[in-house]
Amino acid sequence: KWNKTHPDDQAKLTEPQYAGTSSEGGSKAAEALMAANPKLDALIPAGGGGDPLQGAIAAVERAGKTGKIAVVSTDFLPDLGERLKNGSMAGQSGGHYCDPLIAFMTVYNAIKGNYKDFEGKFEDITFPYLFVASPDDYQGYEKYFVKQLPFTDQELVDMSNLSLEGLKEAATKISIEDAAARFGK
């Protein structure tokens, strides 16, 4: 779809480069991609925000292409706010707070007996990843998901009484914007 609607900005996907689980692997994969594609303007180190991502960022920095190659990935880095400011990261998805919270609330409600005929069934609860693409986005994430809980004490109590469908609905709404709106900010 992108290429059809953006004829002057064609996206070209490269063959994946396996980086392993080390910083060195991420660095070598990024270097290989940059060497094979001199016009490379975006890089998506997959597999999380750990060592391979750090290595890829370092390779882009060594090549003098910080800000020229947009780097995006998953799993928030501890210094993501600074990286968004200096241009070494263009965006990142992650902030998996909602996954353990919703899992805990599901188990808690099941143990309390709030879910009838639940035994042996599989339920899929979908929730959006949090996405940050600017220092302001990161400040919102840090404020509502790192420095405090994204829910008030009363909201957590209310959540502990939700039906499974209600919990699924609550999960779909989790976002930085939702937390800010609920806290009136």
PLM features: what roles do these ranges have?
Residues 1-185:
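A residue-level marker of the well-folded mature domains of exported/periplasmic proteins
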